[in-house]
Amino acid sequence: MLLQRRFEERCAEAYALGKIGGFCHLYIGQEAVSTGSISLLRPDDYIITTYRDHGQALARGMSPRVVMAELFGRIDGCARGKGGSMHMFDKSLNFLGGHGIVGAHVPLATGVGFAIKYRGGDQVCVCFMGESVVNTGAFHEALNMAGLWKLPVVYIIENNRYGMGTALERASAIHDIFERGSSYNIPREQCDGQDVFAVRSAVREAIDRARTESLPTLLEVRTYRFMGHSMSDAVSGTYRSKAELDEYMKRDPIMLLRMQMQEQGELSEDDLHKLDEELKATVQDAWDFAEQSPEPPLEALYEDVLVDTTSDQIAEPVAAD
């Protein structure tokens, strides 16, 4: 969690300095969601997420160097500098990408779940999304299929209360949006997204259900972003007040975890300081690596446009039983 926080803080700095271009959506305030869920996954499980993807990428184990290089648009990034902030990807980790179109990745997650079931595996696909996704048509079609075919997908709604600048209450007739799962006859639950242990408990149950019973789950995780929607958005003062932000920051997930660990005697101030300094050094190393990485050559624009159909990585069809 602390690595994600320190990484995102430096991303904000890099964006202000013009080292990161294009869109950039920070994960500050929501770190308990990625940490509490991804820490439960096996290496062969799958993850697919939205454009706010840096936190999940780091939680899954992507190298901070590679993530930062991608943000800087450099050739050593995970997409060779072509994807940028919204399109982290690592096939070796079954991290199937951040996706820039709201809701477009939800059918892909459902397709991954179908592939798992078709091949007789016991893996799980975890699909992260923001609360605005629930008002897209693709969301409904994908969850209906998952409920109908009983697919091993855990759909995690990171409800941070605002879709860009629109409050949930102004956009959704149902405010407890996990209840939408009842329309597709799938298990559903709501949990506190600022408490990493609450997230972990809820996601563990959903993963067990997917792995042992091949059943999907719709999980609404109530969280809050401490930054604007993107780097072009004001932190407060437009659609939300500073007083509201200050109130939510009293439940900073990292602060809550630190307090719990200190109360239980598991973490001292010296331990925390040492860890923090180590993580800051890790992020600085990622920054230095990204700056030293070359920019992609112009001809790289024409590479990776089409899949190489001669590759032995193309999966052979699997006969159904």
Question: Where on the chain are the PLM-derived regions?
Answer:
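Conserved phosphate/pyrophosphate-binding and hydrolysis machinery centered on Walker-type P-loop NTPases
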Residues: 27, 276, 295
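Short alpha-helical scaffolding segments that buttress acidic/His motifs in well-ordered protein cores
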Residues: 1-2, 68
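Cofactor-binding active-site loop characterized by glycine-rich and histidine/acidic residues
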Residues: 9-13, 17-149, 167-173, 178, ...
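C-terminal intrinsically disordered, low-complexity extensions immediately downstream
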Residues: 288, 292-321
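Glycine-rich ThDP/TPP pyrophosphate-binding loop and its adjacent helix/strand module
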Residues: 95-292
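Cofactor-/ligand-binding subdomain signature composed of acidic, glycine-rich
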Residues: 2-21, 43, 256, 263, ...
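A short structural micro-motif
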Residues: 4, 43, 57, 278-285, ...
